[in-house]
Amino acid sequence: LSDALIEDTGSMYVGNDPSSTTDGANYNLAVGTTALDAITTGFSNTAVGYDALTDNTDGNRNTAIGTYALKDNTTGIVNVAVGSASLDKNTTGNSNTAVGHSSAYSLTSGSSNVSMGWKSAFTVETGNNNVIIGSESNPSTDGGSTNQIVIGQGTTGKGDNMVTIGNGDITNWTA
């Protein structure tokens, strides 16, 4: 750990020192080149991977694991991104969970969304309270979708406050 920076604030940076002043940043862990690079006052963040949470300044209690995970986050709080480029464009969104490569990639400001699967909710820019499960599955609209549950590979939601299960390949339902 000769290249680790351990601060009195309880923060540890491995791989590079942040380019910002970190006096107000407490209990953060960054592992990887430019991980948590812009941190100033954010606390209790975990960033593992190249450019993970790199633009985060004031966001708190975020977890980013993977290259570019939560890369553009600045003030968003309590987000979890696991997978390269998951929640990449999030800046101010809160309480989002994205698992899978490029999951919720374009989401910038939505809150309380769950996205699981390769490129799930990939094009969604805003939206709240959505659950999107399945590779390349998306809600009905890229902006402002609310309370949609979409399950299945390549499935597109039918509208706000609706549940959509399965794509066009489903031919039979059994109970």
Task: State the predicted function of each range.
Residues L1-A175:
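Glycine- and small/polar-enriched repetitive beta-structure motifs of secreted/surface proteins
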